[in-house]
Regions:
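N-terminal basic, amphipathic alpha-helical segments
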Residues: 1-78
Length: 78
């Protein structure tokens, strides 16, 4: 399952690790254009991390134009 192979370490902030992981999955084509990402709440439960870490990772990816959000619909790969 996607996201099950992410191992969180203490070497860098959690949100940075999540951001890098998502960038890799997108680059490899495992998260194709316009595919819906899990909600921040759902992904925080899957990864067993703070929802704020997911929000920070998503915000950074949005600011770089890698993902986008549609109000009431979710977050998608750009």
């Amino acid at each position: 399952m996607l996201f099950s192979d992410l191992t969180i370490n203490d070497k860098e902030p959690i949100y940075v690790q999540i951001k890098k992981y998502l960038e890799e999955m997108i680059a490899k084509g495992l998260l194709p254009h316009n595919s819906k990402l899990p909600s921040t709440r759902e992904l925080s439960l899957i990864l067993k991390v703070s929802r704020n870490s997911i929000i920070s990772a998503y915000e950074e990816l949005k600011s770089e134009g890698i993902i986008y959000s549609v109000s009431g619909k979710g977050t998608f790969v750009n």
